[in-house]
Amino acid sequence: MKKGILGKKLGMTQIFNEEGKVVPVTVIEAGPCVVIQKKTSEKEGYDAIQVGFGTIREKLVNKPLKGHFAKGNVELKRFVKEFRLEDTSSYEVGAEIKADIFAAGEKVDVSGVSKGKGFQGTIRRWGAHRGPMSHGSKFHRAVGSMGGSSDPSRTFKSKKMPGHMGHVNTTVLNVEVAKVIPEKNLILIKGGVPGPNKSFVVIKNSVKA
């Protein structure tokens, strides 16, 4: 059964497994999320639920969104996301989705926006080799050849060049849920997940599981 939840990355720590080995984990505050809208194949053409997470001041929400929340009679939420499901009959508008929908040992996909690195050169951005560092060398970290001269008289599209690095939507696939703490709405994911601390993440069933 498909399922998903929204959360906030709190940071990383480590726990011990049954064998006494240290396991690095990412702590995610997962929910509680509120169902804002329910979509059905009869009306919208597909089955899905729209959920919200996190508090937000009223002055930061525009009028159309305020009306959308008012229609479902739910509080204003900072993050809104839609999850497509095979069956939405078990969900009602206003219902809460909590961290206990997942269990330890399950495989999930975690999506977020990766850390921004700013403007970077080809060495850091693409792993290019640097030039000679010895006396007489005219280039060290500069870009090498970028294309032909008179033919083709241009630089090809998609050439790996310096530029903005990071701050892109990123998903890590098939990672394991190490532990769930339902009373605190925490999910511990084995390893790292995209984004800085306090960033918004989406946790869904693994597509590869």
Swiss-Prot record:
One GO MF term attached to the UniProt entry: structural constituent of ribosome
Assigned keywords, A-Z: Ribonucleoprotein, Ribosomal protein, RNA-binding, rRNA-binding
InterPro entries: Ribosomal_uL3, Ribosomal_uL3_bac/org-type, Ribosomal_uL3_CS, Transl_B-barrel_sf
Region (Disordered): 141-164
Any Gene Ontology CC annotation: cytosolic large ribosomal subunit
Keyword Transcription included in the entry's annotation: no
Quaternary structure note: Part of the 50S ribosomal subunit. Forms a cluster with proteins L14 and L19.
UniProt function note: One of the primary rRNA binding proteins, it binds directly near the 3'-end of the 23S rRNA, where it nucleates assembly of the 50S subunit.
Name of the molecule in the record: Large ribosomal subunit protein uL3
Organism: Clostridium acetobutylicum (strain ATCC 824 / DSM 792 / JCM 1419 / IAM 19013 / LMG 5710 / NBRC 13948 / NRRL B-527 / VKM B-1787 / 2291 / W)
Lineage: Bacteria, Bacillati, Bacillota, Clostridia, Eubacteriales
